[in-house]
Structures are given as C-alpha cells and as structure tokens.
Amino acid sequence: MGTGLENDKPIVVLTRRWPESVEIALAQRYALVRNENDAAFSADQLVAALTQADVLCPTVTDALTAEVFAAAARIGIRAKLLANFGVGFNHIDLAAAKANGLTITNTPGVLTAATAEIAMTLLLMCARRAGAGERLVRRGDWRGWYPTHMLSTQVTGKT
C-alpha cells in the first residue's frame, strides 16, 4: 500500500477485483490500490487499508468488525469513506464505522432485477427439468424425444 498521495490523488483501496473498465476509470482519477490476487482481505489487511487509504471499497467478504475499527483507531484511521461494493452491509459494524468518522455507502436496488431473473431461471429449470436434460446431453445419454420422456410441469398460468 502506498505511503502517501501519489500525484496528490486520494488513495482508494479495492479489497476485491472490480470490472476492468471501472478499475481503469478509478486509476485515472485516484491512486488506486488493487487486490491483485482477488482473495478476501484479512483483518490485518483491513486495518492497514483503513489507516493508509482515503477510501476503502469493501465487499461482503470483508468483515469490518468493531475489533478491526478499534485496531485501526489505535494506529490512526485515515479513511473517510467506505464505498461498499454491493447492496448488503451486514459485514460492516455501522456503529463502529460511524464512531470513527467514516461515511458508509452501498448500492441499494442494484440487484433487484438480477435477483428476480435468477429466481425465474431457477423456477423454470425446476419446473421444466432443464438440469436433468442438460446432464443427459452431457453424458451422451440423450436418445431423442419419446412420449413420456422428461415430462415436467408447465409454468404458464400459474401464480
């Protein structure tokens, strides 16, 4: 992690890899510190990020506990913003973060459509036995259509 501002740019730490286009845009505007191995940060890494960066961008894999904030506070918390990548924030001790002067953001609503689409995918796969059919094809056991083969439930008209 950098020891100071590079070219007077605020230091932003990503605890996990983000989409490449986003990382490129961030690197143009900030002194960006990427997590090249894309593994969850340890408590020690989170403490280091809180004390050395201006902005920490955590994800659900980062346990920002009261203990992490207390350890960072003993050193001196530099970060002012936790820009959470995701909707959920139950991995962040909000009271401890606020007590240490951090602003916390998340992305509410960003997964609503995706969650509904995944639910529909699972519903259709179960009702129409799509997983079983795929396994037959992959094993080379597909013998073609016959009247009782892969009978399933119709979804149309159901609520």
Q: Positions of the model-derived regions?
A:
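Phosphate-binding beta-alpha-beta segment of Rossmann-like dinucleotide-binding domains, i.e.
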Residues: N100, P108-T159
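An N-terminal-biased, well-structured beta-alpha scaffold segment characteristic
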Residues: G2-T105
